[in-house]
Structures are given as structure tokens and as C-alpha cells.
């Protein structure tokens, strides 16, 4: 029986952007998945989260996602890349993957969540503050008003 739960967690663009929900999920997670673009380099999303939530005592699983065109993430995720995450979920653990900004906008965590859900695991998406929203706020700029469309 697949008893663990996977959370895809948006951490915003800076520590003060971390939502209360994201903080709560990261604090209670037993395992943290941190996306990296190069082996041996720290995760930008983890650096943000770590300034708000202690990673002490948590199992850390770095997942390598090189920034390359034409890379089929879903195929890699269906293979052995996610096996350590699946093992933790099979053991009933709470697993959270951090991602910059919001999970729903150009996020590897969204691919991971979709693959794990298709595999039958319980998943949840925790929204974060997107870069364009944070940027507009810093610039004191309204992105759309009245009848205008954002898209």
C-alpha cells in the first residue's frame, strides 16, 4: 500500500515570500527533495527555504535536472531518477519537493507531482508566489485592471 504523501512546494523568490502553508509543510516533512541543475551545486529553492525552515534531521534527496532544451523530464522521472522518492513514499514518509516561485509555472516539481500521482501516490501542490507577481509588486505595477486580460 502506498501510504506516504508527496508535496510540491513553491517557495517564492526570496525567504519572505514563503507562505505559511509552505512553511508548515516543509517543517513537518521528513524528506526534502531539492532540484539542482549541476551536480555538487546547491539548490536555489532549498537556499530560500532553509532561511525559514530548519533542514536539520531531514533526509535530503537532491535531484539533478540540467537546464537543457529537448530534455524529456517525464521519461526520466518515470525511470530510476525518482526511485529514492518512491522508496520514501512506500515507507509512508511525508516528502516535500521545493521549487522556485509557484509550482504551476515552469516547474520541475509539477512534472514530479504528475508522475507520482499517475503512479498512484497521494500528492498535494502548495502554491508559491510567482516571480512575475513578486516583480510586479516590487515595481508597484498592476499587471491588469478592469476588463484587461493577463494572458
Could you say what each language-model-derived stretch is?
Residues 1-122:
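Class I S-adenosyl-L-methionine
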